[in-house]
Amino acid sequence: MRALIIVDVQNDFCEGGSLAVTGGAALARAISDYLAEAADYHHVVATKDFHIDPGDHFSGTPDYSSSWPPHCVSGTPGADFHPSLDTSAIEAVFYKGAYTGAYSGFEGVDENGTPLLNWLRQRGVDEVDVVGIATDHCVRQTAEDAVRNGLATRVLVDLTAGVSADTTVAALEEMRTASVELVCSS
């Protein structure tokens, strides 16, 4: 059984946000268009970076590796899904990073406190497709954790957006090495 995991398509990661990735808004629309046509998913879930007090994950002088400018703060518009993302098919949202930095969707829990992996296993999911922002950070971590947890994993590369070309190329190679299948949505 296959599920789609939509990673962090939030206002702060799209143009105009505090940690914007170029192409984020267009990606939100593209994922919505894809969902309107895709019929082979038994489940669709999403992740959100959702910070309350993440400690040294936030910094006034970020290194953009382990520390970042404030972003996706709980209760702010930046933490909301981008308005171009159609959320009607999303069954559950998994919130990560409330009190620490978190990159993988598998570090997240839903509103009932259920971790993503448990949620997927309870529904018999054994295959996942991963899309979203950012290819070189949260998408990569989510995909690699999916493989580590025994799920057949594909990243739909054309439905991801990365921070920079160099780090995205490196992340794609790391995912390939980790047995993540890299494919296009069409």
Curated annotation (Swiss-Prot):
EC number: 3.5.1.19, 3.5.1.-
Substitution effect: residue 138 to A: Loss of enzymatic activity. No effect on metal ion content
Activity regulation comment: Is inhibited by Cu(2+), Zn(2+) and Fe(3+).
Record keyword Methyltransferase present: no
Gene designation: pncA
Temperature dependence comment: Optimum temperature is 40 degrees Celsius for the hydrolysis of nicotinamide. Below 25 or above 70 degrees Celsius, the enzyme loses its activity rapidly.
Catalytic reaction annotation: nicotinamide + H2O = nicotinate + NH4(+); pyrazinamide + H2O = pyrazine-2-carboxylate + NH4(+)
Function field: Catalyzes the deamidation of nicotinamide (NAM) into nicotinate. Likely functions in the cyclical salvage pathway for production of NAD from nicotinamide. Is involved in the activation of the first-line antituberculous drug pyrazinamide (PZA) by converting it into the active form, pyrazinoic acid.
CDD domains hit by this protein: nicotinamidase (cd01011)
Active-site residue numbers: 8, 96, 138
Protein name stated in the entry: Nicotinamidase/pyrazinamidase
Keywords: Antibiotic resistance, Hydrolase, Iron, Manganese, Metal-binding, Pyridine nucleotide biosynthesis
Effect of residue 8 to A: Loss of enzymatic activity. No effect on metal ion content
Effect of residue 49 to A: 3000-fold decrease in enzymatic activity with NAM as substrate, and 410-fold decrease in enzymatic activity with PZA as substrate. The mutant has no detectable iron and manganese
pH dependence comment: Optimum pH is 7.0 for the hydrolysis of nicotinamide. The enzyme activity decreases rapidly below pH 6.0 or above pH 8.0.
A single GO BP: nicotinamide metabolic process
Family per similarity comment: Belongs to the isochorismatase family.
